[in-house]
């Protein structure tokens, strides 16, 4: 059960940001040709102590959040792995037509380039395509992060970065969520994410859940408890074809956030399976369909 009253509910931060962009956002043309309303610089904070911030004013694709995060953790850059799990959020970016449009004619369909998972687990390694074993190559930022949390929790350098300038030309899409920093205090693990670009309608509900889940998973393997997730955004935008859907979402009243638990004790981040991650008491409003701009 959520500890928030209606006025204090964490979801109101998201809804207020959406309303602010609708009211005051500047129209900008964008890479996709869709057009956006945009503002620069937002921040929200979500408690992870007694609840899990999966938005309730529409149903969020939870299984997609879980499978994508596990895919990142594996270091995978193959969208076909996600497709095989029934998660198709990267299909368009890995399609033959999209790869050819970017000039990646020799790249296999589904090969996204050195995107998030590769940077998390093999930062600095030379990317040579999917299906290659990169074990021991580059810097395993995720492992280093977890080791530091365990051995030196007061360190102020507990960062994980997906923005590798030399690799960006090889990626189908430069990272949107670029930098996360972790912080330990009083036995609680918190995370702050800096996101350079945020699709408020489709992306942000997913991003909040994904990094909150990552924080809970890292807390579990380091014998800490989850503290807080702080979400800092640069270009926060609403695609113009999402405006009506978001106006509908704004009419809905947030419901209590769900809770998260793990089905078993897991000591290594790589050992988590989808079945280990259990979401309870999620009772959202119905899904609201929005088109993904590519």
Swiss-Prot record:
Q: Which residues does UniProt assign to the signal peptide? A: none
Q: Where does dUMP bind?
A: 31, 156-157, 196-199, 207, 237-239
Pathway it acts in? Pyrimidine metabolism; dTTP biosynthesis
The annotated active site, in chain numbering, is: 176
Q: What does the entry list as the binding residues for (6R)-5,10-methylene-5,6,7,8-tetrahydrofolate?
A: 199, 293
Asked if the keyword Ubl conjugation belongs to this entry, the reply reads: no
Q: Please name one Pfam family that this protein belongs to.
A: Thymidylat_synt
Name the coiled-coil region(s). Answer: none
Q: Which GO terms describe its biological process?
A: dTMP biosynthetic process; dTTP biosynthetic process; methylation
Entry annotated with the keyword NADP: no
The source's domain of life comes to Viruses
The record ties this protein, via InterPro entries, to:
Thymidate_synth/dCMP_Mease (IPR045097), Thymidate_synth/dCMP_Mease_dom (IPR023451), Thymidate_synth/dCMP_Mease_sf (IPR036926), Thymidylate_synthase (IPR000398), Thymidylate_synthase_AS (IPR020940)
As its record notes, the protein acts as a catalyst of: dUMP + (6R)-5,10-methylene-5,6,7,8-tetrahydrofolate = 7,8-dihydrofolate + dTMP
- Which keywords does this chain's UniProt record carry? Methyltransferase, Nucleotide biosynthesis, Transferase
Q: Name one GO molecular function term.
A: thymidylate synthase activity
What's the EC number here? 2.1.1.45
Q: State the family it belongs to.
A: Belongs to the thymidylate synthase family.
Fetch the PANTHER family from UniProt.
THYMIDYLATE SYNTHASE, THYMIDYLATE SYNTHASE 1
Listed under subunit, the entry gives: Homodimer.
Listed name of the protein: Thymidylate synthase
Which organism's genome codes for this protein? Saimiriine herpesvirus 2 (strain 11) (SaHV-2)
Gene designation per UniProt:
70
